[in-house]
Amino acid sequence: MAKQALQVAIDGPASAGKSTVAKLVAKRFGYIYVDTGAMYRAVTYWAMQQHVDLADEAAVITAMKSLKISFKPGEPDQLVFANQEDITAAIRQPDVTNNVSTIAALPQVRTILTEQQREMANAGGIVMDGRDIGTTVLPNAEVKIFLVASAAERAKRRYAENVKKGIDTPLAQLQAEIELRDHKDSTRKVSPLTQATDATLVDTTPMSIDEVVAAIAKIITKKQSSTI
């Protein structure tokens, strides 16, 4: 009998479309979606609210002790909570976006969140996206996808998202921020952004969201039929 409840890991750089695609893939297969990036953003937001030095790992860890991150169903997107506070919109603001790489580079923070993410994935039937899901968080995931797109294309996508949210940031600035974040994510000492050796590379630059979802769904369906 084919195994149905797979672990699906989707990795890639900032604004490659991971979250959007992961949500749609999860919905198609009736899987649970875990936004690991939102968890790092939640820690970043929480630490900033506590006026913590984001480079001070001990202080960030202390702040995390009073933080419980949770996800709840929402329409169209799931909601993210810090304790009882809805921070769904707050964690997507530029100040959080531009500081999350600092938090993500802290080894103990990654260890704590990685354990939480693994617990969520234990039962299978889960889609998780981030920077190091296939390499570190879920190294044994049955399906691993690495999404990429050009920095210019990713900047255009981020710009369009920001316009809808009423955020006015010049396109050139967004591309510069994305390129800087790529550098930070790929050169950090702990769990740098890298493609797992057994991951399937999908370049989304010329593709629509529906085309990307269809391509990944095909990979999952094939794996479901071959995993006993």
From Swiss-Prot:
Main location: cytoplasm
Any GO BP: pyrimidine nucleotide metabolic process
Xref: InterPro entries: Cytidylate_kin (IPR003136), Cytidylate_kinase_dom (IPR011994), P-loop_NTPase (IPR027417)
A GO CC term attached to the entry: cytosol
Enzyme nomenclature, EC number: 2.7.4.25
Domain of life: Bacteria
Key words, A-Z: ATP-binding, Cytoplasm, Kinase, Nucleotide-binding, Transferase
Localization (cell): Cytoplasm
Amino acids binding ATP: G12, P13, A14, S15, A16, G17, K18, S19, T20
Gene3D superfamilies named among the record's database cross-references: P-loop containing nucleotide triphosphate hydrolases
Catalytic activity: CMP + ATP = CDP + ADP; dCMP + ATP = dCDP + ADP
Pfam families: Cytidylate_kin (PF02224)
Molecular-function GO terms, alphabetical: ATP binding; CMP kinase activity; dCMP kinase activity
Recorded family membership: Belongs to the cytidylate kinase family. Type 1 subfamily.
Protein's UniProt name: Cytidylate kinase
Species whose genome carries this gene: Lactiplantibacillus plantarum (strain ATCC BAA-793 / NCIMB 8826 / WCFS1) (Lactobacillus plantarum)
